[in-house]
Amino acid sequence: REPADAAVREKRAKIKEMMEHAWNSYKRYAWGLNELKPITKEGHSSSLFGTIKGATIVDALDTLFIMGMESEFQEAKSWIAENLDFNVNAEISVFEVNIRFVGGLLSAYYLSGEEIFRKKAVELGIKLLPAFHTPSGIPWALLNIKSGIGRNWPWASGGSSILAEFGTLHLEFMHLSHLSGNPIFAEKVMNIRKVLNKLEKPEGLYPNYLNPSSGQWGQHHVSIGGLGDSFYEYLLKAWLMSEKTDLEAKKMYFDAVQAIETHLIRKSSGGLTYIAEWKGGLLEHKMGHLTCFAGGMFALGADGAPEGRAQHYLELGAEIARTCHESYNRTFMKLGPEAFRFDGGVEAIATRQNEKYYILRPEVVETYMYMWRLTHDPKYRKWAWEAVEALESHCRVNGGYSGLRDVYFTHEKYDNVQQSFFLAETLKYLYLIFSDDDLLPLEHWIFNTEAHLLPILPTDQKEVEVKVK
């Protein structure tokens, strides 16, 4: 259904045209490969997916469906039926393959009802199970999906697994059990929760590193940005997805949020609320673009907040949204840097060259989407449209959309990658901001951390959870 307001309709149509440009460019120059290099007009394959192909196709499926791009959806489905192959002798990122491939296939199944997507999702889920063969049951980050041999990132603290990686399997794995009738997926993720619950949390905070062999924390670094972010998101969403029956997830979420408020949330002298990083008790006054998702998270969770705190969390979400908007507004390109700082007189600005890039990330418009849905304050549509205009001015190229190496510089230095999440997330959230609320209402649908749609689970799924405990 089209929005009633002609101006909103026109903006929504523009965002659909952006999706068409991104998709058609991918199809023309990189079809079947993982991602597109829009400047050199060729395919790009990230090592995150090993030799699995088609990341952009699977990631874009539900966006194509929602935007009514039917012929494109059908050609994507045909490619998946004929060419999506998980029998590869290669090492993949369990987290990335879960959120993009499993999430994308589940979402496409729930939206379209096409059996091929369910079948492929479950087939891939089974391939990921050997990652859990560790002494603690905390999965490896990397898995060879043919041999079943896993390991962790060599840079991660003392061989640790990463909180945001093993903590961002829960929603998809609950759905895999629901759709396959096999409780093993739910058991694996409920065990992760059990391990986390038994551990002592420093100041109530969850460190980013956990050793899968000893089941103990690695370095005491805490972040709501990269390495931590989606763990917290999935606690809240696990509770919402269970029709609010998963009270353990709810308690873990609100306890964590309380510790975050006490130890990490600060206000700059210029009045901007930000979320710092915690390193063994010392704060680093830096906020990542990835952390900007938290505005939407706080607002989405406001409804279930402890007595009298709902308004507080909506306001906190609005403050984070404002800070992240400032990080965009204070650049030349009007797109935000990868990380921005609040120290030495700087506020919401990247001070290091290696933090000045923008890779088409969605977290800021994701927060605008939740804030729009939950408050209908027109500024969120205004800010979203600013982002659309900046993307069109600076990231759109003849061969698709490219990330930028420096958002403060007066002309574009392209990174030559059209990220699959630009189609999965950034364009989807923008489209939803200019759609009516009855397109994917929040009371029926949960977005995974790659913006893939998962319905609230019917009550029969609770049986699986109970048996696990």
Curated annotation (Swiss-Prot):
The active site is at residue 338. Its cofactor is Ca(2+). It is found in: Golgi apparatus membrane. Inhibited by both 1-deoxymannojirimycin and kifunensine. Disulfide bonds join 292-324. It catalyses: N(4)-(alpha-D-Man-(1->2)-alpha-D-Man-(1->2)-alpha-D-Man-(1->3)-[alpha-D-Man-(1->2)-alpha-D-Man-(1->3)-[alpha-D-Man-(1->2)-alpha-D-Man-(1->6)]-alpha-D-Man-(1->6)]-beta-D-Man-(1->4)-beta-D-GlcNAc-(1->4)-beta-D-GlcNAc)-L-asparaginyl-[protein] (N-glucan mannose isomer 9A1,2,3B1,2,3) + 4 H2O = N(4)-(alpha-D-Man-(1->3)-[alpha-D-Man-(1->3)-[alpha-D-Man-(1->6)]-alpha-D-Man-(1->6)]-beta-D-Man-(1->4)-beta-D-GlcNAc-(1->4)-beta-D-GlcNAc)-L-asparaginyl-[protein] (N-glucan mannose isomer 5A1,2) + 4 beta-D-mannose; N(4)-(alpha-D-Man-(1->2)-alpha-D-Man-(1->2)-alpha-D-Man-(1->3)-[alpha-D-Man-(1->3)-[alpha-D-Man-(1->2)-alpha-D-Man-(1->6)]-alpha-D-Man-(1->6)]-beta-D-Man-(1->4)-beta-D-GlcNAc-(1->4)-beta-D-GlcNAc)-L-asparaginyl-[protein] (N-glucan mannose isomer 8A1,2,3B1,3) + 3 H2O = N(4)-(alpha-D-Man-(1->3)-[alpha-D-Man-(1->3)-[alpha-D-Man-(1->6)]-alpha-D-Man-(1->6)]-beta-D-Man-(1->4)-beta-D-GlcNAc-(1->4)-beta-D-GlcNAc)-L-asparaginyl-[protein] (N-glucan mannose isomer 5A1,2) + 3 beta-D-mannose. Residues 1-469 are lumenal. The keyword Transmembrane applies. Glycans are attached at residue 329. GO terms for molecular function: calcium ion binding; mannosyl-oligosaccharide 1,2-alpha-mannosidase activity. Gene3D superfamilies: 1.50.10.10. Pathway: Protein modification; protein glycosylation. Involved in the maturation of Asn-linked oligosaccharides. Progressively trim alpha-1,2-linked mannose residues from Man(9)GlcNAc(2) to produce Man(5)GlcNAc(2). This is Mannosyl-oligosaccharide 1,2-alpha-mannosidase IA.
